[in-house]
Structures are given as structure tokens and as C-alpha cells.
Amino acid sequence: MKMKTKIFRVKGKFLMGDKLQPFTKELNAIREEEIYERLYSEFGSKHRVPRSKVKIEEIEEISPEEVQDPVVKALVQR
């Protein structure tokens, strides 16, 4: 049985220095729960931001037509 990946748009903020930086990311995953782990991991490795400083405000499933990120769009069109 093959699991179908879904595309999610995530909005939130993270603390960079003493300022809250807004972010919007588009990620593909099988379940919404995977998004949390991938996002925390990415911010930790790229920005050295601890999980407690990342606030995810909204996660919504989007259709392939709504994708704006060129990398995610290329993955979807395969």
C-alpha cells in the first residue's frame, strides 16, 4: 500500500536574536505530525534556534496548484 504525500503550508514565527521573524514554509509529508519535527529540525540546523523559540501558528493542507515554493512544486510535478 502506497501512502500519498500531502502538501502543507506552515506559518509561524521564530526568535532570531531579540526579534520575532515571521516565516511561511511549504513542505510535503504523509501526515501533519511529520511537519512539526521537520520544521523544528530545519530551524535548529540552519538557524541554531531551539524548539522552544519556534512558534507554529498555522498548518494548512494545500493543493498542488496552490504551491508557490519552486522546489516543492518540482517535487509535486514528478
From Swiss-Prot:
The keyword Ribonucleoprotein applies. The keyword RNA-binding applies. Coiled coil: none annotated. GO terms for cellular component: ribonucleoprotein complex; ribosome. InterPro entries: Ribosomal_eL20, Ribosomal_eL20_dom. Keywords: Ribonucleoprotein, Ribosomal protein, RNA-binding, rRNA-binding. It comes from the Archaea. GO terms for molecular function: large ribosomal subunit rRNA binding; structural constituent of ribosome. GO terms for biological process: translation. HAMAP family: Ribosomal_eL20 (MF_00273). Belongs to the eukaryotic ribosomal protein eL20 family. Part of the 50S ribosomal subunit. Binds 23S rRNA. This is Large ribosomal subunit protein eL20. The gene is rpl18a.
